[in-house]
């Protein structure tokens, strides 16, 4: 005789089991309408066959890596004609489609020799296996998790030889009974060549277009192309700007090169306000101190091939009367021959240059005073003076030069003295225009 407590527990258990059995029955019913207990009408069809055909026309390629790479297009099949109440397992393997090793030459795949020995046969078992026939028929069977590798590392991955053509095969095995039955299906449009990197750009474009997980690859490619476009103008400007680097003030936000340019004795030392660390990634491979975004600066000066015109582009400074002409100069060597001023500057040329020496020229009384002390300054303790003497100012010269004191000293730490190596001797004499 059972106790009332046992009867209550039995009713509670029966209640819980009922809803579980109901869920199982619903699962068994799904897909049963496509079932056939005799299995005489078993059919397996390829999903996305039109997409597979587009890839086949171009000779499809699949990436193989050491850690394994998933396939695209994803292999999916729809199944009908299974016994809804029988148990089945779905398996996938790959067989060689021909007896060639392939190579990509002049935009097409051609046979390239004898194939390598086939790796041990690897079989991928669908993770839903085993399951009822009704389960397999209710929705397309997707092999989205299979990974292709070129290393024998196990883990359910399929090992393939690179540059060999393969064809996937799907096997359906009936399990759970006394008799094992198996049926195999393959689709020629799913053939592909295993590669470690895509060879055909059209295949790459199709993969990016139809694979939602390839959008990151597309974005990375666009960023890379944009970076290349940004670097190209920077590289082309390098040759034109590097020789005028001494015209840039010390407060510039441009970076010195990691390795000095061969024609300079060494990089210029810039003040602590320098913004070099803003572009740390450019220091290891750029010989020019100008990073690629330099072309987008709105306040960038306009450079001219005429050195005389460049001399006149510097801002005026109120300390001109206190400056004199040193016995040597820290101006870097030039690779261009200078001609007469072109008149592109708002100031006339203030210097008369001849045979490697710098001579102050005449300046009108109403002219703005001098050049900033941060330009043309070097350390007299380390620089090698030029062999030419600096002539005295002419009688008609500006009174600003008469009795001018010695040039203002600038700390050695601000500039590297090795940059004041020499001055080219091909300057053309320039006379200031009459006012």
UniProtKB/Swiss-Prot annotation:
What is an example of a GO molecular function annotated in this UniProt entry? Answer: RNA polymerase II cis-regulatory region sequence-specific DNA binding
The record's subcellular locations are: Nucleus
Protein name per Swiss-Prot or TrEMBL:
T-box transcription factor T
Segments for region (Disordered): 280-310, 384-412
Alphabetically sorted, this entry's keywords are: Activator, Developmental protein, DNA-binding, Nucleus, Transcription, Transcription regulation
Alphabetical list of Gene3D superfamilies matching this protein: Transcription factor, T-box (2.60.40.820)
First-listed, main subcellular location of the protein, grouped into a coarse class: nucleus
Q: Which GO terms describe its biological process?
A: cell fate specification; heart morphogenesis; mesoderm formation; positive regulation of DNA-templated transcription; regulation of transcription by RNA polymerase II; somitogenesis
The record lists the organism as Canis lupus familiaris
Q: Which residues bind DNA?
A: 51-219
Locations of Polar residues compositional bias? 297-310
Subunit notes for this chain? Monomer. Binds DNA as a monomer.
């Amino acid at each position: 005789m059972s106790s009332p407590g046992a009867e209550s527990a039995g009713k509670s258990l029966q209640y819980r089991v009922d809803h579980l059995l109901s869920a199982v029955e619903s699962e068994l019913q799904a897909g049963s309408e496509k079932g056939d207990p005799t299995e005489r009408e078993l059919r397996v069809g390829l999903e996305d066959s039109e997409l597979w055909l587009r890839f086949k026309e171009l000779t499809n390629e699949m990436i193989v890596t050491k850690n394994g790479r998933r396939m695209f297009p994803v292999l999916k099949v729809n199944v009908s004609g299974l016994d809804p109440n029988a148990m089945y397992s779905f398996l996938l393997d790959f067989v060689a489609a021909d007896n060639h090793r392939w190579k990509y030459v002049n935009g097409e795949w051609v046979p390239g020799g004898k194939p390598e020995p086939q790796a041990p046969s690897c079989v991928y078992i669908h993770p839903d296996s085993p399951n009822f026939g009704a389960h397999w028929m209710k929705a397309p069977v997707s092999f989205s998790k299979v990974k292709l590798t070129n290393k024998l590392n196990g883990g359910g991955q399929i090992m393939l030889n690179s540059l060999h053509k393969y064809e996937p095969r799907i096997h359906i095995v009936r399990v759970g009974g006394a008799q094992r039955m198996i049926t195999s299906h393959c689709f020629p449009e799913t053939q592909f060549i295993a590669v470690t990197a895509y060879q055909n750009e059209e295949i790459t474009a199709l993969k990016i277009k139809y694979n939602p997980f390839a959008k990151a690859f597309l974005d990375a490619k666009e960023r890379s192309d944009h970076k290349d476009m940004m670097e190209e103008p920077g590289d082309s400007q390098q040759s034109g700007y590097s020789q005028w680097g001494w015209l840039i003030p010390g407060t510039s936000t441009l970076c010195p090169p990691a390795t000095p340019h061969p024609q300079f004795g060494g990089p210029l030392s810039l003040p602590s306000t320098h913004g070099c660390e803003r572009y740390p990634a450019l220091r290891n491979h750029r010989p020019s101190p100008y990073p690629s975004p330099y072309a987008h600066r709105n306040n960038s000066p306009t450079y001219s091939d005429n050195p005389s015109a460049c001399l006149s582009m510097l801002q005026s400074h109120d300390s001109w009367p206190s400056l004199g002409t040193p016995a040597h100069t820290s101006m870097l060597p030039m690779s261009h021959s200078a001609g007469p001023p072109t008149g592109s500057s708002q100031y006339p040329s203030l210097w008369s240059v001849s045979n490697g020496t710098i001579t102050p020229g005449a300046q009108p009384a109403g002219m703005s005073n001098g050049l900033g002390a941060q330009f043309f300054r070097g350390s007299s303790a380390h620089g090698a003076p030029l062999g030419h003497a600096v002539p005295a100012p002419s009688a008609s010269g500006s009174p600003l030069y008469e009795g001018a004191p010695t040039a203002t000293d600038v700390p050695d730490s601000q500039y590297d003295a090795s940059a004041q190596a020499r001055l080219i001797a091909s300057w053309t004499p320039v006379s200031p225009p009459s006012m």
